[in-house]
Amino acid sequence: GMAAWLRTLGVTRTAVLDRAAPGQEGVWDTFARMPELRTPKQLNGLDMGLPALSVQRWYIARFGEAAWASIDRIPRLHWMDYLRWYRATLQLPVVNGVEVLNVRPATAADEAPAEDCIAVDTLQDGRPHTRLSRLVVLTTGMDGAGAWRVPAFIADALPADRCHHSSDAIDFTQLHGQRVGVLGHGAAAFDNAVAALRAGARSVDLCFRRARLPRVNPHRHIENAGLLTHYARLPDAIRWQVASHFRRVDQPPPRGSFQQACRWPNFKAHAACPWDEVRWTGHDIDVHTSQGRFQFDHVICATGHALDLAARPELQSLAPAIARWQDRFTPPADQTHPVLAAHPYLGEHYECLPRTPGIDSDWVTRVFAFNSLSYVSHGPHSTSISGHKHALPRLVRGITQRLFLDQAHTLVDDLQRYDTQELDLPEDFGIKPAASEPTPSLAALA
């Protein structure tokens, strides 16, 4: 969406670097396993206000008016098909099979054409290559601030083939006839439980720490134009309180995934059942909880991602140089939260800001974080599907503003040199002729 929007504004020298193979970008046809998006079908904004590019128009053209009217959420694989169509239709400049190794200020060794360049070190087809760019946008999704991670006390205790994170590429056919334990209560937990049940798992026990599943989805309350458009202008104290609230009050699993899991007689959900100890007996996975012991053949941890900028190779130069919330805001003593404090403190247009003003300020502010790094600064929905309609224009304004201001020093000289004629007249037109010379008529000049 960003690349398409930039093109409409005349920014055409762009490249979208993606590690995945063509058509496999993102999570939708890889480890996302829900039957449908949890975002209501009307809350998406990749169409740039052009109805012909909307998912609604695409869906109706492919499946018909009745099919669109019958759904309230878009099926996941249909959404991925729409994204493939969107990319092909707009001929977006995606370069696949590229792994970004580092984003850093360009040096003399990079032979940068200007001092304001960013160097992007990449690996493609086994060969290193450094690309130069005036600006860089990080669009690395939910794990762009760290890594999907299995709790260490589980990962360290089990053979690798007996334990997976819900974001892993799991061969569910291998779970046929097995006892499967799932840790977590969110969308990924129930989606993976359903996938295991469909694959013929003997039993699936889903365990979670909370005393009861959330019923209310607080995310729906902030999916409005005012918040999604102007969230970054809120005072720091309010943004901090909102982020803190969402750390305490989680959203429920999607209704469809929950209902599908509960239809299976060999599925059980266990509230207030955190895993206290996990052991490998040589044959079984022995899990100790406050509700007793469980024995599994395989476990899936739907435990989300850890904030860990050091886990992202592309952030190795950026992470030490950027401002964090702990550098710019001190919450009341009863609102402290070390994870939120470690998030980057971003500018209004998602630009990174220097930890120490005046040091590294130019190159750092040329990097925009349109991913989970923006969670505290721009809100929990900013870079999700429901936020695109409002967030993408703000991001694009920041990019074009920076490109324009970079060229401000050329404005006056360019203006003074501008000499494109709009009216084609003889050079001597308007010069008072001698008395003996007739005045040319306008008709003769036409």
Report residues per predicted region.
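A short alpha-helix-loop-beta-strand transition element characteristic
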Residues: V27-W28, P40, M48, A67-S70, ...
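Flexible, active-site-adjacent loop/turn segments at secondary-structure boundaries
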Residues: D29, P35, L53, R57, ...
